[in-house]
Amino acid sequence: IYYQGSKGSYSESVLLEMFPDSELISCKTFQDVSINASNDGFGLLPIENSLVGTVIEAYESLIEYELEIFLEVKKKINHALIGLAGTQKQNLKKIISHPQALQQCSKYLNKLDVELQPVFDTAGGVLSLLNTKSEEIGAIAGEHFDNDERFTIIEKNISNHEENYTRFFLTGKTPPPIKEDKNLRSAILVAQDEPGSLLKALTVFDVLKLNLTKLESRPILGSPWEYKFYVDYQNSDTKIDQLLKDNLGQVAKEFKILGKYGSINL
C-alpha cells in the first residue's frame, strides 16, 4: 500500500492500524501514490479535512489515474508543536510542516512571531530537524512523536478546533476483500453549459431520494470558466446507481461514479 509522506506521517499511522501486515511504501507526492496504485497494489490518499476542506491535489490525482475508491477511513488529527530535545517555544524562529497542517493550526501560529515554511509532509518535517540540529526550528506533526527521545513536544492540541478529522480514501484498480457495507458513493458531475442545468441534475438526486453529503465545484483544466462538481451521496442499491446514471445522462454532460464504499472511524 502506497502513501504520501515519511515514516511517522498520519497516513502511515492509518495504515499501521488498519493493515498492520501489509507492506507500506512511502511516496513523496500524492501523484506518486496514484501512479504506483494504478500499476500495483493500493494507495491511501487524504481527501478532506474537517477544518480546511478538500485536499485538491489528492482528489485530482485519484481522478487523473482513474483509481477506484474502495474504503473511507476517518481519523482524528491531533497536531503538536515539536522540536529537538531541549527546544523551548520562546526560542523558535521558524516552524515547518505540510501546508495542510499549517492551515489547520493557523490561529495558533498567528500568535507566534515566527517564519512559516511549508514542506512535503508532517513527519518528514520533524525528521529534518535532526539535520538542522537547531533549537530555533519547530515542526508540526502528530503527538505520537512524544515516544521518540530525540524530540520534545513543545505544545499539544494546537489545531484551530479540537474536532479535527481527516478523511482518507483507500484506492486502486482491483477491489480488496473488504467487508464493510458499501453504502457511500463519490462521483464527478459535469453539468450542461446552459441555464438551470445544475438544478436539473440535482433534481434527479431528489427524485431518487438520495442524500447528497458533498457538492463542491472545481474548474475544468483547459476549459476556462467551466466547472465540474465533486459529489458524495448515500446509497447502497446498485440499481439506484444505474437509474441515477441513466437519468443524469439526459441532463448532464458527464457523470462518473468514482467508488462505492463503506466507512471506518479510527
Language-model regions, residue ranges each:
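Domain-level signature for soluble enzymes in the chorismate/prephenate branch of the shikimate pathway
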Residues: 1-266
